[in-house]
Amino acid sequence: MTAPFVLLAPLRAGEADAARAAIAALDEPFARVPGTHLARIQVLRPPPRRFRGTTNDYLLLAADHDGPAESWLAVAARELDAVLAHCAFWPGAADQAEVVRWARAREVRVGFSVVGAPHATVEDVGEALALRRFLSRFAAETAGFDDDALHAAWLAR
């Protein structure tokens, strides 16, 4: 089952540009985190508030993933360590328990997922897309076949 995870972590003062540069240097990090349906990471600057002084920049990490958040976070943290290192109190990616503790303390509970098939795993979706490609190709190759030829082509696949 797909689960959302949203994290909003304050960046250390003056590190927003470095965090943006670290994000820009990433090479599809979520492709290396198994079970990730979709994910986004970016630096946010909240609107200024009157009489509140300076406004901190934040790192937003939003993802829909398969399985327990703890195991997903452990792998994602290793891929994103160069970015997360700009966050206040980041413990580093080496200790999974500390990563989970840190992330859970900054988690924003959203209660919904934007994935179209929330009960399907990434693997299920991949298999369904492969089947769709196969059936589309088969339909194109057999267009105009009579019943017997179509049946024979199906059995020969």
Predicted region positions:
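Conserved short beta-strand edge segments in small beta-sheet-based binding/regulatory domains
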Residues: 81-95
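A common structural junction motif
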Residues: 27-30, 79-85
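"Short basic amphipathic alpha-helical interaction patches in structured regions
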Residues: 74-78
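Short S/T/G/P-rich N-terminal loop/turn motif that feeds into the first structured element of a domain
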Residues: 1-58, 63-71, 96-157
